[in-house]
């Protein structure tokens, strides 16, 4: 048999012959899975002991016969899948088990972890092993390795590896900080790869700040987007603080013996940090040993920046999570350039983990002490390499240049370089699992934190870590390469290098090295402005001056700091970045390297380094069409020639508070800008009486400044005025006039952000997204409301916390380097609540997970994304579907062709309902098709009685492990439900009949289903549609379909044994005022109530009758040409009839009338949707024949002729029919059966049935489309083929409109007598 045969008969036949085709078994499984999705599903609740209040996770045994479930009563129940019976109870946890897993190979072995930090491995045949974490922290996830005796335990920011034959785990790996909690660990089915989910550090410090993806496509626009960063105190905490941490590393001292000092003032506030030493990480350590050797924070250190860093690092030793976040975004774009997407390589710039759980250190081996780099001579080798490539082993100084030994031990980690050789040319450090240091001797391990020259100095002992290379890689991977320039001689080379690092606006800027030069003892800290230049060319808006402060981030040729040499060659060699050369007009200013400068608080957005001038803002020069910088210089050297025309221009005023303006219409944008301008002008006028203030001298050596000439120089001084706003003091050039905003600014302000990152105009704007701060605040409120309602899973989806999924190669049992957030990132942002929030297919080729949507809302939408785990397209999103925040569980079918999404109750979003959809099943049909890549197949509905009103949420939903077996789910009410497919043709019924909900009997009796009459006419196409309507209407009248009763033959009339349902059971609605309101009852079901009426159940003194209508085949000939729009001659009888019916009801005479839509007058009877009055009872004694005739005369049959003959005929036919059925009562006499049969075939009423458009021939087949044809989309040609005798003899087959009750029927929709 050829490959790809999908015919099950051929496959089975070939298997019988002993020649099965390739993958034939899998094809059969796929066919089974496809077939079962179209079957009816039946739910079975598992009877659990103790009736737990909630069911959390589900797991299946490797032999697929057992299912384990965790519950809120701290127990674990084992259930047989086939029988649905609970067979085991595992008791022993002190708190709720949060994670659960079976061993994929060993039968009867199950592991569970609870919220108090206890891990238990249960043997269902008896016995268990347990281990308790030291801090009693909750166990987040567990994973058995398929082939090794190894259990992975995720708790807090650690992953423990436990061989349960030992008392405790033998090793542990940790993330870079305590806030990077590990939420999920999962092996692929073969155990070759390990999946980890770790909290993204960017979510922890400040949820209000945006997370800027560093994608290769977006990198050229990154600098433009930096225009839109937030206020001075909170701008870009991720990359900003990361670069600040980088600049806090000190290099070896200069040739003059100068010592290094702390470079980051924010890292000097070591008060709140009492954690262990993290010097091996290359971070600023706050332990007691390192703090004693650090210079205290200077008295004028700005507390705002320290507080901002402290706010981001209050739970860990230093803000080292930012570099991980920064590097994480670029890994996907770099992956395509590597030899393989994810090999067993790890970034050399990552933090390593502690291999020993008993270590007294912080638990993260992290970066072992990286030695300082020696100075390179002017003509250093490798001049063609990129800047920063010198931090290699070959660049180590003499005291720490020894190479590290190769790894030792079975559990050691093999590290390969992830940087391309032409980019970095460095060797990856190799770690051993036997110690927390590199392969060097213990004696040099600690001394390498500081060179001998720095041992006695009160300076920072920070080292140049591999993270510095990550910064270099970050720029170089996207900006390309250039040849480096020849470095200068002496210490100016180091100074120039430091300035180039700080001014790293242009990644192509060449430089001799990447290590940081030390500072002088008189001026220990560099300014924040100087450090912020590496913050991807940020332009920060100053609220006070209403201008964009460039934050001292000059380009390669702009003003040079004391480290900048005076050589003119340097200015001409370094080019300007292509993305910025149209923005700035650079003004190089030379200065001497020994000029001290007082420290200025960072909140003033001034340069507090050793610069001789400060950047006040940027102005737009209309003459040159460029942005020009405005500097503040020292008082004694104000010779900088600043363009007066530039000062008179206005900069864009896109503050974070006004982010919503970008999506407004130009008119609204201009109006908002005008309001801001007027408010700002009034604020300036309030301070206009203040005397002009001169800036303080910035340097004690003002003669060192020699500004470069600038065109349009009209003044040698710049006057500044100080003012206060929002509690802060600001300075602005006095001659920089304010101008009213113009509409022309609107176009210019929109170019700095990509559309997907543009915030909305506001909540109520149809085009925009909410501001980041507003969006985060509202989501926090919603999450708090939801979690207060007990839906922590939904709150987790609403919250701003995201997780990164990393895919680790475990074929060689290499420990995952989870401390490095930039390597092996499979999904950078996703939502994880528990183990049910992520699933790997049985074949290990697909990964399903929820990711946040780019479109913000209240709350955010989520996206179900299915990624590929195949080697050729690893990490590629194949399928996606949008969901609300209540999608909390996902499971891939055994064959990987369907996905089930478990839903929590949306009680805060939707009204309460009795029918709860708890899950949806989708078919994966077309990759890369967006929303159409998945097609919904069916919904999983929780079985609940209509009188029960409670919210039901899914905690976990899983497919049963074998194809076609079904699915199972656990709810927040403690239910464990197994759904199995049932063949819809097993009982001879159709799919649509089974898809309808069966209704509960509200009374003592029931009737047979009208679908049983489908056998009266072979090939009837209305059976399915009619039965759906029957069930709906019978539920309204309190009836339920039951098996059909035996039919009887009486006087040649074939009909079923009929019963009369007491009318009192059908009166549960009020009478509406509008007589023309159409009925919502699906009338064909009332037919069943009529055709099975039991007249013998009525009391003897009661008079009841069935008044049928004649079929359309006996309609009078003259009615054939009647106009439907022509008013009836008896239209006046309509109102009279309605009033008569209401009067009878008011007097208690009439108790029930069952009807259908406005267009029809009678409830449907029979399999053809015939329209017949069911019954009504008169309580005031027996009904005489005259009364019956009188009642029929009250509403004459509408039509061109008089209604009296038709009324008599109808009454006469009632007599014959009731006599046939054995009805006890008197009826009208005088018309024989033949005449009755002829008159029985009446006509449709155009006046009272506006849906009817044509008449019906009384002698031949019908050519018109009746009410049922309009409602059901079918003609009556099938009905016309029947002889009139059959129609007249069987009222259940009469599709006629009874005009006697035409009006009354339409007037009783929804009343107590209808339905």
UniProtKB/Swiss-Prot annotation:
PROSITE patterns reported for this sequence: WD_REPEATS_1, WD_REPEATS_2, WD_REPEATS_REGION
Biological-process GO terms, alphabetical: autophagosome assembly; autophagy; chordate embryonic development; gonad development; locomotory behavior; mitophagy; positive regulation of free ubiquitin chain polymerization; positive regulation of mitophagy
Biased composition (Basic and acidic residues): 378-388, 1022-1031, 1061-1072
Comp. bias regions, Low complexity: 696-715, 1009-1021, 1286-1307
Pathway named in the protein's UniProt entry: Protein modification; protein ubiquitination
Motif interval(s): TQT motif 2: 1065-1067
WD repeat placement: 50-89, 92-132, 134-174
Annotated stretches, region: Disordered: 294-322, 342-409, 426-463, 502-526, 545-610, 630-660, 681-736, 985-1134, 1181-1208, 1286-1315
InterPro entries (alphabetical): AMBRA1_autophagy, WD40/YVTN_repeat-like_dom_sf, WD40_repeat_CS, WD40_repeat_dom_sf, WD40_rpt
Quaternary structure, from the entry: Component of the DCX(AMBRA1) E3 ubiquitin ligase complex.
Protein name: Activating molecule in BECN1-regulated autophagy protein 1A
């Amino acid at each position: 048999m050829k490959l790809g045969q999908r015919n099950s008969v051929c496959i089975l036949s070939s298997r019988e012959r002993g020649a099965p085709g390739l993958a034939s078994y899998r094809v059969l499984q796929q066919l089974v899975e496809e077939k079962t999705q179209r079957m009816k599903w039946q739910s079975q609740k598992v009877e659990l002991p103790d009736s737990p209040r909630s069911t959390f996770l589900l797991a299946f045994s490797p032999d697929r016969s057992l299912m384990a479930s965790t519950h809120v009563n701290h127990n674990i129940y084992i259930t047989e899948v086939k029988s649905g019976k609970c067979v085991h109870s595992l008791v022993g946890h002190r708190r709720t088990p949060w994670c659960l897993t079976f061993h994929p190979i060993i039968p009867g072995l199950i592991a569970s972890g609870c919220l108090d930090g206890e891990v238990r491995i249960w043997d269902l045949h008896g016995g268990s092993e347990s281990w308790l974490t030291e801090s009693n922290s909750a166990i987040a996830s567990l994973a058995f390795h398929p082939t090794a005796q190894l259990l992975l335990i995720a708790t807090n920011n650690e992953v423990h590896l436990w061989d349960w034959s030992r008392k405790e785990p033998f090793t542990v790996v940790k993330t870079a900080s305590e806030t990077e909690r590990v939420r999920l660990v999962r092996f692929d089915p073969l155990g070759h790869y390990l999946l980890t989910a770790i909290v993204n550090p960017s979510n922890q410090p400040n949820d209000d700040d945006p997370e800027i993806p560093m994608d290769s496509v977006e990198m050229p626009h990154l600098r433009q987007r930096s225009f839109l960063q937030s206020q001075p105190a909170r701008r870009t905490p991720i990359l900003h603080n990361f670069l600040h941490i980088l600049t806090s590393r000190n290099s070896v001292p200069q040739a003059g013996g100068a010592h290094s000092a702390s470079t980051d003032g924010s890292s000097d506030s070591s008060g709140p940090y009492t954690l262990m030493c993290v010097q091996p990480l290359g971070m600023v350590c706050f332990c007691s040993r390192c703090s004693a050797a650090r210079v205290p924070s200077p008295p004028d250190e700005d507390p705002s920046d320290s507080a901002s860093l402290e706010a981001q690092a209050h739970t860990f030793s230093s803000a080292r999570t930012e570099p991980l976040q920064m590097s994480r975004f670029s890994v996907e774009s770099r992956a395509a350039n590597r030899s393989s997407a994810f090999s067993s390589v790890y970034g050399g710039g990552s933090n390593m983990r502690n291999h020993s759980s008993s270590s007294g250190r912080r638990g993260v081996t992290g970066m072992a002490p990286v030695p300082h780099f020696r100075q390179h001579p002017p003509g250093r080798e490798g001049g063609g390499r990129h800047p920063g490539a010198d931090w290699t082993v070959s660049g180590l100084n003499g005291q720490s240049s020894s190479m590290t030994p190769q790894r030792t031990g079975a559990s050691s980690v093999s590290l390969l370089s992830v940087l391309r050789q032409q980019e970095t040319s460095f060797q990856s450090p190799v770690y051993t699992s036997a110690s927390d240091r590199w392969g060097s001797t213990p004696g040099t391990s600690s001394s390498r934190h500081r060179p001998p020259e720095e041992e006695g100095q009160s300076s920072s002992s920070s080292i140049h870590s591999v993270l510095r290379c990550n910064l270099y890689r970050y720029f170089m991977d996207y900006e390309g390469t250039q040849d480096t320039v020849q470095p200068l001689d002496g210490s100016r080379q180091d100074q120039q290098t430091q300035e180039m690092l700080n001014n790293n606006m242009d990644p192509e800027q060449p430089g001799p090295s990447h290590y940081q030069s030390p500072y002088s003892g008189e001026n220990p800290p560099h300014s924040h402005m100087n450090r912020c230049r590496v913050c991807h060319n940020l332009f920060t808006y100053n609220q006070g001056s209403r201008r964009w402060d460039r934050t001292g981030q000059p380009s390669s040729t702009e003003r040079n700091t004391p480290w900048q040499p005076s050589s003119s060659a340097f200015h001409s060699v370094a080019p300007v970045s292509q993305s910025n050369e149209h923005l700035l007009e650079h003004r190089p200013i030379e200065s001497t390297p020994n000029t001290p400068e007082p420290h200025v608080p960072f909140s003033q957005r001034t340069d507090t380094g050793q610069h001789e001038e400060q950047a006040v803002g940027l102005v737009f020069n209309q003459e040159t069409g460029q942005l020009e910088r405005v500097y503040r210089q020292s008082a004694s050297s104000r010779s900088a020639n600043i363009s007066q025309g530039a000062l008179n221009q206005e900069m864009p005023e896109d503050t974070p508070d006004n982010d919503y303006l970008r999506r407004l219409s130009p008119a609204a944008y201009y109006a908002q800008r005008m309001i801001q301008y007027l408010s700002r002008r009034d604020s300036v006028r309030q301070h206009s009486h203040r005397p002009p203030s001169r800036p303080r001298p910035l340097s004690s050596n003002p003669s060192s400044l020699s500004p470069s000439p600038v065109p349009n120089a009209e003044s040698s001084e710049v006057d500044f005025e100080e003012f206060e706003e929002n509690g802060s003091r600001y300075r602005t050039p006095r001659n920089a006039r304010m101008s009213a905003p113009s509409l022309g600014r609107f176009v210019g302000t929109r170019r700095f952000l990509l559309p997907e990152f543009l915030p909305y105009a506001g909540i109520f704007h149809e085009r925009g997204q909410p501001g980041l701060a507003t969006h985060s605040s509202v989501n926090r409120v919603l999450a708090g409301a939801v979690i207060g309602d007990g839906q922590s899973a939904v709150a987790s989806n609403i919250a701003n916390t995201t997780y990164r999924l990393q895919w680790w190669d475990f074929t060689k049992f290499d420990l995952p380097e989870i401390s490095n957030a930039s390597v092996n990132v499979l999904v950078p942002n996703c939502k994880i609540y528990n183990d049910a929030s992520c699933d790997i297919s049985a074949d290990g080729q697909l990964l399903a997970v929820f990711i946040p949507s780019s479109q913000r809302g209240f709350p955010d939408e989520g996206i179900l994304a299915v990624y590929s785990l195949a080697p050729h397209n690893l990490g590629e999103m194949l399928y996606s579907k949008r969901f609300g925040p209540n999608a909390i569980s996902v499971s891939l079918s055994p064959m990987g062709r369907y996905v089930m999404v478990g839903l929590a109750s949306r009680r805060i979003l939707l009204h309460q309902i009795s029918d709860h959809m708890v899950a949806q099943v989708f078919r994966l049909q077309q990759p890369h098709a967006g929303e159409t890549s998945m097609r919904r197949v069916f919904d999983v509905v929780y079985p609940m009685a209509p009188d029960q009103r409670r919210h039901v949420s899914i905690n976990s939903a899983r497919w049963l492990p074998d194809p076609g077996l079904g699915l199972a789910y656990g709810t927040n009410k403690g239910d464990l439900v197994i759904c199995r497919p049932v063949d819809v043709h097993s009982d001879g019924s159709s799919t649509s009949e089974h898809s309808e909900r069966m209704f509960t009997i509200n009374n003592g009796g029931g009737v047979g289903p009208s679908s049983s009459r489908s056998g009266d006419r072979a090939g009837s196409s209305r059976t399915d549609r009619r039965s759906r309507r029957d069930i709906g209407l019978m539920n309204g009248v309190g009836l339920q379909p039951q098996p059909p009763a035996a039919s009887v033959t009486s006087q040649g009339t074939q009909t079923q044994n009929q019963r009369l349902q007491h009318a009192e059971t059908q009166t549960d609605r009020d009478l509406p005022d509008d007589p023309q309101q159409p009925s919502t009852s699906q009338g064909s079901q009332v037919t069943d109530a009529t055709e099975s009426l039991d007249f013998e159940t009525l009391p003897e003194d009661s008079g009841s009758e069935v008044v049928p209508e004649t079929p359309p085949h006996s309609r009078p000939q003259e009615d054939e040409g009647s106009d439907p729009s022509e008013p009836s001659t008896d239209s006046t009888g309509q109102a009279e009839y309605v009033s008569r019916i209401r009067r009878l009801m008011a007097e208690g005479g009439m108790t029930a009338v069952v009807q259908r839509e406005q267009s029809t007058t009678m409830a449907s009877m029979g399999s053809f949707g015939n329209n017949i009055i069911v019954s009504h009872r008169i309580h005031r004694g027996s009904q005489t024949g005259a009364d019956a005739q009188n009642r029929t005369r009250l509403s004459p049959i509408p039509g061109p002729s008089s209604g009296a003959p038709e009324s008599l005929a109808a009454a006469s036919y009632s007599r014959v029919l009731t006599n046939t059925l054995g009805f006890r009562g008197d009826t009208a006499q005088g018309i024989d059966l033949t005449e009755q049969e002829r008159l029985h075939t009446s006509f449709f009423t155009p006046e009272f049935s506006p849906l009817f458009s044509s008449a019906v021939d009384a002698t031949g087949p019908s050519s018109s489309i009746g009410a049922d044809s309009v409602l059901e989309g079918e003609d009556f040609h099938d009905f016309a083929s029947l002889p009139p005798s059959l129609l007249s003899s069987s009222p259940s087959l009469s599709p006629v409109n009874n005009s006697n009750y035409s009006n009354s029927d339409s007037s009783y929709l929804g009343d107590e007598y209808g339905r």
